[in-house]
């Protein structure tokens, strides 16, 4: 799995200037004012969620499509794609619904989801 999501993937519904063009983001779709698609807003966590829901593939094999497999194809599997001694320790913590809770790069936490308790 891959994503070519543009900057709009992280934006709320509204109008934005992206790449020198006006882009309208609505319901997780980015379009130009004339209605043409402006680009992808599919994030990798959503792609993984869709992939498992629509194929019935098991979690371990699904995770490999966004970790080990691309690292091997890009010839960076000596340091990326899995957690092992001597590797970079880049990983994401997520729940059963693929909601991201934390992201680590080279073993350092760079993102943590803030949970608001009601």
What are these regions (language model features)?
Residues 1-3, 8-87, 91-93:
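His/Asp/Glu-enriched, well-ordered alpha-helical/loop segment
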């Amino acid at each position: 799995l891959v994503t070519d999501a543009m900057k709009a993937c992280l934006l709320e519904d509204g109008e934005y200037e992206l790449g020198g063009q006006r882009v309208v983001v609505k319901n997780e779709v980015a379009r130009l004012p004339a209605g043409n698609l402006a680009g992808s807003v599919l994030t990798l966590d959503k792609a993984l969620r869709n992939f498992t829901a629509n194929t019935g593939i098991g979690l371990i094999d699904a995770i490999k499509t966004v970790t080990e497999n691309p690292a091997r194809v890009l010839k960076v599997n000596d340091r990326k794609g899995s957690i092992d001694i001597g590797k970079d320790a880049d990983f994401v913590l997520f729940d059963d619904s693929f909601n991201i809770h934390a992201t680590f790069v080279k073993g350092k936490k760079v993102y943590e989801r803030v949970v608001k308790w009601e």
